Amino acid sequence: MQDNIEKLKHYGYEIVEPAHGMLANGDMGDGRMPDEELLFEYIVKEIAFEKDMTGKKVLVTAGATVEAIDPVRFITNHSSGKMGFALAKNATLRGADVTLVMGKCDSEPPVFVNTVKVQSAKDMYDAVIERADSMDIIVKAAAVADYRPKNVSSEKVKKQDGNMSIELLSLIHI
């Protein structure tokens, strides 16, 4: 069976792998029918778009970066990641090999993309720079922080009477 699947892949056929979950015999494992939404995404990927980006490697950034103040508090923004997700999905549907570098996002990333999850602006910078030379196209749609706290406490900062001031440092642009 595996030899036949490998032959089909060799000839360019897309194989939808079985899903993981509860099987008919009560065991957990691979062998379930993939869910309908995933099957639909496979069909759309194969027939709905011209494959004008086949062979292209695309990196897309999405979402918000998170800059820690302490282990509990952080500075971020309201970016949902939807724009970056839409760009990544569209490039994938057009045949590109897509890497999505994502910060904090409101939803799950699109299927068929290589996902790299990051937290801070430095994490995102490092992830992009590490992959940049191997990409044909880079789309920067993330909402990256412009500043980070100068001092990050290793413990939760206790509430005190009066105001709290946080000195911020400018961050490098990606």
Regions of interest found by a model, annotated:
Residues 2, 6, 56-120:
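Glycine-rich phosphate/diphosphate-binding loop of Rossmann-like nucleotide-binding domains
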Residues 151-167:
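Mobile active-site "lid"/loop adjacent to the S-adenosyl-L-methionine
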